[in-house]
């Protein structure tokens, strides 16, 4: 199918993510293949994929061994829910992830994507405390400018107002604290490195909301969509101390 016809079909039928449905797609780039870190469009232009396919193609495009593994699995068993059943590949992968995970993390709950993973984690935290006889623990804490997904619960935890306003009101109980942006931090402008003020703000939020109402704290290792903010040394250790307290 030629490029012009693909553009016509896209204009009539394709609704791109994070894109208004009435956006004019005339002249849009249509990517048709990839190899390593490069992509090619339907007009033969080559691009460097610096985004790694939205961070999910770190191993590169065109990996035939990965395609073969996926095809082999689909030929044996394409899909079956792991409710009260299991299957060898899921069990083996869960065991491998448990082996690689730090500390006593040894259980794996598979999801289909990041937003669903965040939703599931919030649900897990709520269910845990309800079973512990603490049903009032429903709130979660996350950072300003954080990105945790776009489904309703995950979007509530997300701290990017520009992608939230059209879907409000969102799920209540998602509390925000400062991000670790040293460049614009009013609390440590005169310090050579960002201090732990942002971590201490989590404790302040817990006390303000009531510790008996908090179920979980959601933090990206490095904030990405909000500006690539690396936390200062000791940040996560301090957060761990606060949560344990």
Model-found features: residue ranges?
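Active-site-adjacent loop/helix segments that line or gate small-molecule/cofactor pockets in enzymes
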Residues: 1-35, 198
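Glycine-rich loop-to-alpha-helix module at the N-terminal edge of alpha/beta enzyme cores
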Residues: 3, 46-134, 141
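A generic structural signal for well-ordered alpha-helical segments
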Residues: 10, 70, 242-243
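Active-site and channel-lining beta-strand-loop segments
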Residues: 28-49
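Short beta-strands and strand-loop turn motifs
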Residues: 48-51, 178, 216-222
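PLP-dependent aspartate aminotransferase-fold enzymes
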Residues: 95-215, 234
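Conserved PLP phosphate-binding loop immediately N-terminal to the Schiff-base lysine helix
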Residues: 183, 220-233
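Catalytic PLP-binding core of fold-type I/II PLP enzymes
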Residues: 229-245
């Amino acid at each position: 199918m030629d490029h012009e016809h693909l553009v016509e079909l896209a204009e009539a039928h394709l609704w791109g993510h994070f894109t208004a449905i009435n956006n004019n797609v005339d002249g849009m780039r249509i990517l048709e293949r990839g190899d390593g870190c490069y992509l090619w469009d339907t007009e033969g232009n080559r691009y460097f994929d610096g985004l790694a396919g939205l961070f999910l193609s770190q191993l590169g495009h065109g990996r035939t061994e990965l395609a073969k593994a996926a095809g082999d699995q689909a030929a044996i068993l394409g899909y079956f829910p792991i409710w009260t059943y299991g299957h060898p590949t899921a069990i083996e992968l869960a065991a491998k992830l448990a082996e690689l995970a730090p500390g006593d993390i040894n259980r794996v709950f598979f999801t289909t994507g990041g937003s669903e993973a965040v939703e599931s984690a919030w649900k897990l935290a709520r269910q845990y405390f309800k079973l512990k006889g603490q049903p009032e623990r429903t709130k979660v804490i996350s950072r300003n400018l954080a990105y945790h997904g776009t489904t309703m619960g995950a979007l509530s935890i997300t701290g990017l107002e520009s992608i939230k306003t059209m879907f409000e009101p969102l799920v209540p109980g998602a509390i925000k604290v400062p991000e670790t942006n040293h460049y614009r931090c009013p609390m440590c402008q005169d310090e050579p490195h960002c201090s732990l003020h942002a971590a201490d703000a989590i404790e302040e939020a817990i006390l303000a909301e009531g510790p008996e109402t908090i179920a979980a704290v959601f933090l990206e290792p490095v904030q990405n969509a909000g500006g690539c903010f690396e936390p200062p040394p000791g940040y996560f250790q301090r957060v761990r101390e606060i949560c344990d307290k």
